[in-house]
Amino acid sequence: MTGMALRIDDIRELQALLADRLVRTPVVRCPGLEARYGRDTRIYAKLEFLQHTGTFKARGALSVLGSLDKAQLAAGVTAVSAGNHAIAVSFAASALGVSAKVVMTR
């Protein structure tokens, strides 16, 4: 993927990149919440906490790293985070065989 324009081929490439690296998490209805908001309300939750990293952030990290060219990947990546983003970047880098440095505050 390049720039801000998103093409259908970009989506297909990203789908292929993510398919064998992420858990296909379920989508479930939330009847308790639906009852609060009326009978015609349907509320769904995507259970991304079931991902390897425990959050949805692995999708974004894999997407960004997957968009880098070979020279950029060879240089490695750096993330500044002490939370879920750090975990996701570490996971994505490992999955793609890329060196990663995670910087955390004290």
Language-model-detected regions and their locations in the chain:
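PLP-dependent amino-acid enzyme catalytic core
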Residues: 1-106
